[in-house]
Amino acid sequence: MSSLKGKRIGFGLTGSHCTYEAVFPQIEELVNEGAEVRPVVTFNVKSTNTRFGEGAEWVKKIEDLTGYEAIDSIVKAEPLGPKLPLDCMVIAPLTGNSMSKLANAMTDSPVLMAAKATIRNNRPVVLGISTNDALGLNGTNLMRLMSTKNIFFIPFGQDDPFKKPNSMVAKMDLLPQTIEKALMHQQLQPILVENYQGND
């Protein structure tokens, strides 16, 4: 995937802690392909401890993987627009809460500011959703983002249609291919994919 070599990619983490195990191998792959990956984290990522791990541990892990200090404030994220422009901004996982804010032009976290700065530069933003209400109240926000210029999605599908019928999660292993397409301002297809791992 040599097309990613030398590309400056912002990588935003939001608070879907249960999805990190699927995301971090993709960060490592981007680094191995020669991309310059700049980590960006929301306030919740840094401060929240869950059964999936402590916030500080996840931040240290992404810093160790990328070799860069995590951007953890809106002030630090703002220069990604004019002074340190990204070739592409990734938000994965993207929670329903952050998706709602992004769709409605709110910039109250470092990750959302980094996305706004990238869109301002007419560069692609890649989203990897992980939300329990993608087919519920957040459906309108999902559709709004899908029809927004310079926003692209890691293909996604229902992860548990019987127990959580409104839930949708991106297939994170498709992230590198999605970025390659997004850099050409194209959406990786198909965008709706089978993502159910159960036996029902």
Swiss-Prot record:
InterPro entries: Dipicolinic_acid_synth_B, Flavin_trans-like, Flavoprotein. It catalyses: (S)-2,3-dihydrodipicolinate + NADP(+) = dipicolinate + NADPH + H(+). It holds the Pfam family Flavoprotein. The keyword rRNA-binding does not apply. One of its GO terms (biological process) is sporulation resulting in formation of a cellular spore. Its EC number is 1.3.1.-. Induction: Is not expressed during vegetative growth; is expressed at stage 5 of sporulation specifically in the mother cell compartment, under the control of the sigma-K factor. Is repressed by GerE. Keywords: NADP, Oxidoreductase, Sporulation. GO terms for molecular function: oxidoreductase activity. It comes from the Bacteria. Disruption phenotype: Disruption of this gene has no effect on vegetative growth but causes a sporulation defect, characterized by very low sporulation frequencies and heat-sensitive spores devoid of DPA, which can be cured by supplementation with dipicolinate. Dipicolinate synthase likely consists of DpaA and DpaB, since both proteins are required for DPA synthesis. Together with DpaA, catalyzes the conversion of dihydrodipicolinate to dipicolinate (DPA), which constitutes up to 10% of the dry weight of the spore. This is Dipicolinate synthase subunit B. It comes from Bacillus subtilis (strain 168).
